[in-house]
Amino acid sequence: MKYQVEVCIDNIESLHNAIAGGATRIELCSSLALGGLTPSAGLMYSAGRVSPIPAYAMIRPREGDFFYHDDELSIMAQDIRTAHQANLQGVVLGLLNADGTIDVKRSKPLIELAHSLGLGVTFHRAFDHCVNPEHALEEIIALGCERILTSGLARNAYLGIERLAQLVKQSAGRISIMAGAGINAQNVAEIALATGVNELHLSAKTTRPSEMLFIRSESKMGAADCDDFIIPVTSRDALQQTVHALAALNSVLH
């Protein structure tokens, strides 16, 4: 089995690190600290130019829930067009109704737009907030998505192993179940083996200090608990260790 390793990134430095670390696909975002929002057009175009592996743009216009209004849908549609114009390979989205069901009515035109532009579609972890995952899985398959990113409705994929395995069984090859949330080199092999997933999603996040020589500590750009002089980035080494753990599992299985 060939495992796919998708890395979510929100800056160009992390893109380079993810590629060097062995990622097979990129989820392109902004604001990973908020769960990932739509990346800037500039980052999309940069990824489209430099990435030798597929890159999918997050289409999420704001933080918070996944219940969207018409003006937000217009923004999402334009962002899908931008992803296409930037030569990306796909988009990542997810919409729910207020009752926790999949918003099929509003998802369909966005997914059809993406398909008309030759883009693949991943349904993201809005799935983990749905009221009936078994029914939601069937609806997402019918919508034509390639895969679902999910933690198995748990706080992280390790805790969601049992549900992930059930989803893989139910999907029966009709859609890929991609495990995500809290995946690292220490647990990735166990998660893959126990669930049967062949796609795994992680950030491999670390931080590095700012290169600024002058720091005005009394001025803050964001929330009080955010350090403006610590830069979150993807760790090439942590990602390589995760990729190697999967390769070792693959060699044992084959």
From Swiss-Prot:
SUPFAM superfamilies on file: CutC-like (SSF110395)
* Pfam annotation, one family: CutC
Range of residues in the leader sequence: none
Which InterPro entries does the record associate with it? CutC-like, CutC-like_dom_sf
Where is this gene product found?
Cytoplasm
The UniProt record lists the keyword Secreted: no
Q: What keywords does the record list, in alphabetical order?
A: Cytoplasm
Do the record's keywords include Cytoplasm?
A: yes
Q: Name one GO molecular function term.
A: copper ion binding
| Gene Ontology cellular component terms for the protein in this record | cytoplasm
PANTHER family noted in UniProt? COPPER HOMEOSTASIS PROTEIN CUTC (PTHR12598), COPPER HOMEOSTASIS PROTEIN CUTC HOMOLOG (PTHR12598:SF0)
Family (UniProt): Belongs to the CutC family.
Q: What is this protein called?
A: PF03932 family protein CutC
Organism for this UniProt entry? Vibrio cholerae serotype O1 (strain ATCC 39315 / El Tor Inaba N16961)
